[in-house]
Amino acid sequence: FEKQIEIAKNNYDVIGSNILEVDQNNEIQNLEKQMPTSNRDIKKYLKSRNPINHMTAFYKTDLVKKVGGYPDFYHREDYGLWIKLNYHGAIFYNINESLVQVNGGKSLFKRRRGFKNIPAEFKLQLLCYRLKIKPFYLAILHFFARVIILLLPINILSKFYIYKLRKKK
């Protein structure tokens, strides 16, 4: 966390970074999840996608306590927290570098899909609407778009992630 500690001196409340995905054999897949870096770009990105890779997150715990901590949103607790922190004026920053390697592949896609994720997605979109992150119609549109993605077969979902949500390194 050396880089995050140094950057935190600039009064950022939440600091993250890009991640590099590896497969089950710890082999690099050459897939990087790149994130927006500036506070302005992160807040814009927040309206449609999770702007902080949770495993890289470095944040002020007093601010997290002030907003009531993580919401109870199955597999979306971190995204819900960033939404709450944004509403309370948190300042975000992402380091434009992959500081962590994460397990991608089928295990990632199995966790990210299925009916069990739908109620949490609804709660997340409702939170976005209630905290004025997005208008109601957009929250509903995003909810239904994500439900479709959540119900995709793993082989199609993996291609969607690889070709639409990741960058080749």
Sequence positions of predicted segments:
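Surface-exposed charged/polar residues within alpha-helices that form helix-capping/stabilizing sites
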Residues: 6-7, 44, 127
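Conserved nucleotide-sugar donor-binding catalytic segment
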Residues: 23, 31-115
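C-terminal subregions of glycosyltransferases and related glycan-biosynthesis enzymes
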Residues: 74-75, 80-83, 87, 92-169
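Conserved donor NDP-sugar-binding/catalytic core segment of glycosyltransferases
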Residues: 1-30
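Glycine-centered small-residue hotspots that permit tight backbone geometry or close packing
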Residues: 16, 26, 68-69, 132
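A generic structural signal for ordered secondary structure
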Residues: 8, 12, 31-32, 91-93, ...
